[in-house]
Amino acid sequence: MANRGPAYGLSREVQQKIEKQYDADLEQILIQWITTQCRKDVGRPQPGRENFQNWLKDGTVLCELINALYPEGQAPVKKIQASTMAFKQMEQISQFLQAAERYGINTTDIFQTVDLWEGKNMACVQRTLMNLGGLAVARDDGLFSGDPNWFPKKSKENPRNFSDNQLQEGKNVIGLQMGTNRGASQAGMTGYGMPRQIL
């Protein structure tokens, strides 16, 4: 956690809630996928959130991962170098995030650089990597390595084509929101406040 002191009060409660969202089982799946997917040897961290964060913190593993999802020669991150300088590490994380967005990840699904670098929200980092893996499986371009069942299946577009005849017939059907013209009705019922007529 960089140069920040401990959180107290409400900030501490919020931080604890965020930390509870972190999934250790998902961490192992992501590590397995990243080590399988990357073309170069990126190592393997010990189990635990801090070890996972330190493994990804300099951005080199993330850049290798996004480059491995593109064909040879079309890698989005051209220069990957390990560095101990904070701004270089954060720059590489930013390059990964920009490349992930170009790959097709929604802006709302992408973590902030500080979430990873300061370890503020590692669950958000996991969600971004899960979305990236799911999108790589859905693309089905032969560049995904690993078990497709590791990631949730993305839905695919399934357009419907109706003929003009079918569209015209649909206009004749009374929608369920309108009620029905069959079954019990209020015919013969008296209004409120009127006496009941028994003959």
From Swiss-Prot:
Ranges for the Calponin-like repeats: 174-199
Domain of life: Eukaryota
One annotated GO biological process: actin filament organization
Positions of modified residues (Phosphothreonine): T180
SUPFAM superfamilies in alphabetical order: Calponin-homology domain, CH-domain
InterPro entries for this protein: Calponin-like (IPR050606), Calponin_repeat (IPR000557), CH_dom (IPR001715), CH_dom_sf (IPR036872), SM22_calponin (IPR003096)
Cross-link Glycyl lysine isopeptide (Lys-Gly) (interchain with G-Cter in SUMO2): where in chain: K171
PROSITE patterns with a match to the protein in the record: CALPONIN_1 (PS01052), CALPONIN_2 (PS51122), CH (PS50021)
Calponin-homology (CH) domain residues: 24-136
CDD domains found in the cross-reference section: CH_TAGLN2
Expression sites (tissue/organ): Expressed in epididymis (at protein level).
A GO cellular-component term linked to this record: actin cytoskeleton
Keywords per UniProt: Acetylation, Isopeptide bond, Methylation, Phosphoprotein, Ubl conjugation
Residue numbers bearing the N6-acetyllysine modification: K17, K20
Modified residues (Omega-N-methylarginine): R182, R196
Modified residues (N-acetylalanine): A2
Residues found modified as Phosphoserine: S11, S163
Stretches of the chain forming a coiled coil according to its record: none
Molecular function, one GO term: cadherin binding
Protein family (similarity comment): Belongs to the calponin family.
Identification of the protein by name: Transgelin-2
Organism: Homo sapiens
Underlying gene: TAGLN2
